[in-house]
C-alpha cells in the first residue's frame, strides 16, 4: 500500500495502543518501519502519530510496542495539570529543516503522555533506527521537559498539532511538504 505514495502522515488524537492496533489491523506496521528505514519518502507523525515512532509506550497501565524507529519510551507526564492542552513554546535546534523560518513561536498541544527527557542535551544525542541523527525539539509543561518534535532523515514528527497552530503550524507543514 505505502509503496505507491509520495509521503505518509500518521495523524491522531487518542491512545497509542489503539493507534498501533489500527495500524496492525491494516498490516501497516512493517510497511511504515521499512519506509522509514529506507528513507525514500517523507513521513510525518502528529500527536499520537508522533508517539507511534518510539520504541514503547505506557498508557492507562498498558505497555504497548511502538514502531521502534526512534529510541525512547512514551509515558504519562508527571505534572499536576493533565492533559497538557493549549499553547506552548517549542525549542528547536537552530538547523532543522522542519522549523526553517520559525523562531520563538507557540504551538497547540493536547496530550497526557510524551517522551520525557532528563535533559535537553541528552535528547539531542540520539540516533534513529535509520542511522540518521535524531534532531529533537523540546518543550516544558509544568516542570516536565519532553520531546515535542523530531527530525530524523525523512522522518519528522510533532507532539503538537501543526494544523491547529496558526501561521507557525502552516509554515511547519509547508516546510515538511517541501521535503516531498
Set out the residue ranges of the language-model regions.
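A short, aliphatic-rich alpha-helical micro-motif
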Residues: 2-3
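Cysteine-nucleophile active-site neighborhood
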Residues: 7, 13-86
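Amide-donor transfer/coupling interface in amidating biosynthetic enzymes
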Residues: 37, 71-180
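Glycine-rich His-Gly loop
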Residues: 12-15, 48, 112, 160-162
